[in-house]
């Protein structure tokens, strides 16, 4: 059963097991909380749709547990963005359609094998923030069959400081070949010294 409620400063939607709650924090700034059994690529899909709508992701924490995702996004509506209280975040996350991986630039990164979640890659990175950075990164990783099981995204003073725990779709550690391909993609995204 679908349920929805909307006020001047908040909106709530429930669709099946998925739900979203949006709260206006300040002029143009919103907190979006989402939960549900979303597909592996949902973060890539949602971030792509948000970038297409001129919505900047300021910071995020998302985590997958027991087949359910829980996430909190702090979003900034840029000029020509829609009213973020009226966006159907569940529909966007479940749409199954994402833009293709665009180019992105990293200033630095570190990729480590981790035992977290039964075997993941932990990626930490720093980059100049830009609209679509997260979308491009996640889309590039999805092309390698890598998806985050947990991520922390933070933007400070125009800089992105991100940490992601990556696994294959359905969980499980990436293969040595996937790790090598991931290093190639990340090395190719490093900014070149002037």
Region spans (language model):
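Regulatory modules associated with amino-acid/nitrogen control
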Residues: 1-194
